């Protein structure tokens, strides 16, 4: 590389002798592996003391939808188990998922070079955070059981790229079942 001072406050750099060789820098997180978190919930029946609850095994169907571009769990429709548990499986968040969301939410970010295929160049050393929101909808009926009037719940997963190669995910709510 040859650098010349043009005398106008601008330095001009010229590359010489590449002969078909080039350098390509690649930014990956977690060794290229996604970061995962389970989307689980629970169907809860409340009943007066002394009453036996109805058997609800498989009686309620839960469907998950994600906002545009959100990675989806292993299953998008499930029924509840005998204990009321609901398990959609793992959601795998990749750096590509993260970068597509970031580029959509931050088009003004000149430090991010959005590419046509949805990938984006990383901003080394600067933490970035995006959120993916999912809606879980319940359907089903059991004689003697009054369903909750609010048949939908939302769950938000926050994914952070620390800018140094680590991608992490947290969930809101953070503790217990994702939804009840």
Question: What positions do the PLM features span?
Answer:
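Solvent-exposed loop/turn and edge beta-strand elements of beta-rich ligand-binding domains
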Residues: 1-180
């Amino acid at each position: 590389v040859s650098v010349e001072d043009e005398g106008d406050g601008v330095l001009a750099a010229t590359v010489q002798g590449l002969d078909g060789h080039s350098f390509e820098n690649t930014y990956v997180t977690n060794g290229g592996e996604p970061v995962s978190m389970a989307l689980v919930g629970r169907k809860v029946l409340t009943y007066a003391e002394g009453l036996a609850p109805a058997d609800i095994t498989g009686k309620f169907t839960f469907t998950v939808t994600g906002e545009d571009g959100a990675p989806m769990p292993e299953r998008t429709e499930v029924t509840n188990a005998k204990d009321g548990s609901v398990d959609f499986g793992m959601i795998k968040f990749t750096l590509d998922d993260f970068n597509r969301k970031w580029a959509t939410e931050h088009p003004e970010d000149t430090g991010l070079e959005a590419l046509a295929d949805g990938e984006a160049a990383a901003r080394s050393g600067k933490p970035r955070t995006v959120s993916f929101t999912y809606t879980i909808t319940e359907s089903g009926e059991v004689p003697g059981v009054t369903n909750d009037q609010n048949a939908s719940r939302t769950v938000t997963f926050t994914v952070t790229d620390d800018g140094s190669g680590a991608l992490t995910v947290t969930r809101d709510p953070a503790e217990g079942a994702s939804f009840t």
